[in-house]
Curated annotation (Swiss-Prot):
PANTHER family: SERYL-TRNA SYNTHETASE. It is found in: Cytoplasm. GO terms for biological process: selenocysteine biosynthetic process; seryl-tRNA aminoacylation. It comes from the Bacteria. The keyword Metal-binding does not apply. L-serine binds at T230, S231, E232, E284, T382. ATP binds at R261, R262, E263, V277, E348, L349, T350, S351. It comes from Streptomyces avermitilis (strain ATCC 31267 / DSM 46492 / JCM 5070 / NBRC 14893 / NCIMB 12804 / NRRL 8165 / MA-4680). Pfam families: Seryl_tRNA_N (PF02403), tRNA-synt_2b (PF00587). This is Serine--tRNA ligase 1.
Amino acid sequence: MIDLRLLREDPDRVRASQRARGEDVALVDSLLSADERRRSSGVRFDELRSEQKALGKLIPKASPEERAELLKKAEQLKADVKAADVEQHEADEEAKRLLLQLGNLVHPDVPVGGEEDFVVLETHGTIRDFGAEGFEPKDHLELGEALGAIDVERGAKVSGSRFYYLTGVGALLELALVNAAIAQATEAGFIPMLTPALVRPRAMEGTGFLGQASENVYHLEKDDYYLVGTSEVPLAAYHMDEILDADKLPMRYAGFSPCFRREAGTYGKDTRGIFRVHQFDKVEMFSYVAPEDAENEHKRLLEWEKQWLTGLELPFQVIDVASGDLGASATRKFDCEAWIPTQGKYRELTSASNCDSFQARRLSVRMRDGKKVQPLATLNGTLCAVPRTIVAILENHQLPDGSVRVPEMLRPYLGGRELLEPVAK
């Protein structure tokens, strides 16, 4: 959540942020009104309690005639205090409810607009000219099926659309990617973590996934647990309700977990293959830093993502995501998009988000610097979302005979294998 003091002091900045996100600007005024009600009801409660305490001291000293009147007044004050307490609680709950609906403040350098209004910051690698090489590229599903690596037919039979099996070299390729990603993250100073896939509502709400993103979250209603769409959620909640020493920051974790997404609103989009699925595995980087270090940490996360994609020998571009496509928690987000030959365009493989103190305030994660205690900043970045990375590798490194060249970086994790070759049917 944002700092309420900032809302009170500069509401126009918050309105501008909501407008840039394409969200309801009237929410800001509703929150301001609720905050004023909360504060005024708090003042009234304190005044009545003070009057009640003062009256309580007078009653023992009063004459019999005065005491009867004072007791009558005390009875009325008791009712007034109780009513004021209820009013204060209701006003406080309303303000909290509205505050949780408000997205993070958009960074001033973020391009304003919707999904297509991003700005390309960098391009890396060379896009292959398959025409010059003399063959038509196959898509990842055709390649994967020929390699005995992907089985979507049985995935659909068992679980429905957007499910799949990784088999044979497909399974080995996932394990190689995960081990390589964890190795890179560990070398960079991240602590590897295997995280829960089920979390309580507070963890999901605290990370900002129960607002505009809630339609994509799986909820186990009977037990009131949520399936995570990213290990960002359990990693952000790992230090919930804790105060961390400033001299121990930054604290960096690399989480590996299954991820579950309903993909609501994507009917008919990316239905072929494993690019957009309901369940996948992912290695996620997560950082806790001092607020003043957040922007530099954001750049570091992006550099680690670029290192990863460069190591996989993939052509990719880096974009500055537009304000309407940020998600509730991020103040700024950089995506790395790999070139997908059969689609003829770049597609998102990684995201790096600066959430500044938004998640930390909601989850009560703070830092102590001397005598000062304050919310810290959290950031997250995808290192390897497995299915999409497999899509990019298969399509970009395919050869005319349907085999796929293994990037040199991955070979030690595949027993030195240089090629993935089609299997006999």
